[in-house]
Each structure stands twice: as structure tokens, then as C-alpha cells.
Amino acid sequence: MSSQIEPDAEAAKQRGNELFAAQDYEGAIKSYSESMKLDPSQWTYPLNRCFAHLKLERWTEAEADATSVIDLDESNAKAWYRRSLARKGLGKFASARADLYSYGRRTRDFKIVVEENSKIAAMEAAIVKASVDSPACRFKFVDTSNHGVGAFATRSFERSELVLVEEPLYTVSEIASPRQIATAVSRLTDDERTELSLLHNTFPDRFDDSFVGIHRTNAIAAGEDSSVLCLRASRFNHLCTPNARYSWHAPSKTFRIYALRSISEDEEILVSYISGRNIYGSSKAQRQARLQSMLGFVYSCTSCTLPSAEQAASDRRRQELTQLWDTVPHFPPSQTAARLNAIARAIRLMKEEGYDADEDDFTNDAAVICAFHSDWESAVYWGIRTYESRVAEFGADSRRAMDEEVLRFLLEPQKHQMAGRGTRKVFKTRV
């Protein structure tokens, strides 16, 4: 009687491990596949095969294997991390980030999250920048029936995905004089000046030089004291509940637009020309006054032309947000729970208003409060929300996402300058 039997799943896995160590990834994949056939309930085998596929840059196969592991064991941190790598390779950048965050929450290894997130950001930015003026461009400009030219998505977007990366035509001081603007324009090529002349000018009677009027109409703030002129970014229209966000990326000196929420193919991509509390904490009348001072005419977006009852409710929400912003810093230490509840209330109001930006205006304060009272779990929770918000709106490789205080809450909340100064308390407030 023959003693020859089919190798069991563990033996096949061991062979696969030996082949993997010898860098025979094809052979390892075959052995791991054999293990999976013998015992499809064991997550170790697809996890190992996923790693071999990653080594061969077979992103689709690696993604499928990691997903099968997650289906078998949702708590498996390695599977989330490896699927993030696979999705980065596939160009599924928003999904790659989401998987990376799942890995971080399970392991608290936020150093890896920050490092890998920066790599994802760099790869995505390079691809998006190269796609402009090509069939792969993520948007197209279309004449609308009621508000001029607008940018419309040629594919769907998820929150945090890049829509545009653009080098500006020129950069000047935010308070540049007409002569300084004219000097910047004079340095452009003839073709660039021709393209610039096609942009809208809302001040034709105010400036003798039409390029100065075009600049005043279309220039965008870049950093604390500069403004830039971008041929493409300037054509995106405004909405007081935008689905995308302007962002100046100082390290690369490029202007970027990020999706703030899901955007469908053929949907118009809309940004806000004003920011912070000037947008989310201002009534319709206040916003329109600011826009008129900037643009020279009354700009009425769909968020400013709601039925009267809805408009009044919107104004109340935004005015309450300003009140919360003003009062949150003044709660005494004895009322920290109420202070956190006020922060959570502000974030919920933003969501009710359909406003998907600037959450970090409140969450960063919450992280400091919790660290002050040595509630490290809550400090990390609010720190994660701050980091994820800034990554989505400014990029993982931006100065705001890489801010030392933000990263401190992820990596070492106990070392924050305010950590442990108050009475130890534990808070349950979450959003």
C-alpha cells in the first residue's frame, strides 16, 4: 500500500515561504494557491500570496487576496495595509488612504500611516499633473446656461481625491499694484497672454490695463501673502457648500483642487472663493457682500437661492457655528465635557449644512483639551480626525497635514506641550 499522500495545506504554505525567501515569487504563489485549495478557511494563505503578488506588482491580484483575508478576518491589520499598497499601485488613491487609516486604527502605527500617505500623495499628484490637457484629464470645461463656463467631472471622485494640479502662470504679492501685475504679465509668452486674455474680467471700467482687471477677477490666494494666476483653476465656479476645495501646495509651488465629497461623472465641480468662518459661519447676506466686494457683482449660488424657510434655517446653522467658534475657547477646565459637546455640535451643524470642509477648525482644539486631561485615547481620536481632514483637503504631503502639533497627537500625544497639565478625566464625546 502506497504511503504517498497529497501534501497538507501547512506543508504547502511552508514550501511557499521557502520559495518566497529565495525570491521565487511565482513558485511561492503556486504553493500558497495549493494551500488555499486545501483549506479555504485559513486567512494566512491568501495573506502570504498577496505579499508575493505585491512583490511582482500584480496589483489586481494582490487587492483580491487582501480583500479575501479581510472577509475572513476583518481585524487583520496586515491585510488592510497590503490592500492599501495594492490600491496605490492601481491608482485607487482614495481607497488606498481609507485602507491605510483602517490599518492605523488597528495598530496605532501612525508613523507608517504618515509615511505611506505621503507616498500616495506624491504619486497621485504626479499622475494628475501629467493628465492635464490629455484625454486622461479628470474634468472638462463646459459653457453652462446660467453661470458661464464651468468645470465638469469626466469621472467620479471620492473625498480626498485630486481633481487638478496646476503650476501658476505667475505669482505676485496679494496686494500687488497694477504696475507689478503688468510686469508679471509682460514676462509671459505670447500664447500665455492670449490664453490669459480669454479669462473673465469683471472690472473692465476700473482698470486701463485689461490684464489687471483679469487678475483682480481671477487671482487666487497662495499662502499668507501671495496670489497666483492659474488658467484652469480660475475657471472653477463658486458654491457656498462646495464639493471641492482650492489648496496652495507650497512645497511644490502648485495649485491644487481636492474633492471634498463624492462627485459623480458629469457633475459640476464647485469650489468656494471664500474660506473658513467667512463661508461656513456667515449668513447668505454676509457671504454675498464679501463676494460682491471681491468680484464686483452679486454672486448667487444654489446655496443662496433656497426657499425662504430653508434659507433661514441655513443662516441659523451658520450663525450658530460662529457663536460656537467664539465660545469654545472660553470654557473653563471644569466644563471640558460641555466644551467637547460644543465642538461635536459644530461638526454636526457643518454636516447638516452640507459643508464638508474645515472640521479641523474644531477637532484640533478637541485633541488639545483631551491631552490636557491625560485622556490619550480621546486625544488620538480627535487627532486622527484632524489629520484625515487636512489630508483630504490639503494633501498628505502638505504643510497643514504635516504640522508638528497634528502629528504629535498621532505619534506621541503625551509629549504635547499641554499634555497632562489638568486633572485626569476620560471623555466619551465622539462624532
Question: Can you name each region flagged by the protein language model?
Answer:
Residues 2-124, 337-422:
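Alpha-helical protein-protein interaction scaffolds
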Residues 143-148, 222-226, 289-291:
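Short aromatic-glycine motifs in intrinsically disordered, low-complexity regions
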Residues 164-246, 281, 293-305:
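Catalytic cores of histone-lysine modification enzymes
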Residues 11, 38-40, 47, 57, ...:
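Eukaryote-biased feature marking scaffold/signaling PDZ-domain proteins and nuclear chromatin regulators
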Residues 76, 93, 154-158, 162, ...:
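Conserved tryptophan-centered aromatic signature that marks the ligand-binding surface of SH3
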Residues 422-431:
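C-terminal helix/juxtamembrane-tail motif
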Residues 122-183, 238-260:
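Conserved AWS/pre-SET-to-SET junction and N-terminal core of the SET lysine methyltransferase domain
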Residues 4-6, 238-389, 401-408:
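C-terminal SET catalytic tail plus cysteine-rich post-SET Zn-binding segment of SAM-dependent SET-domain
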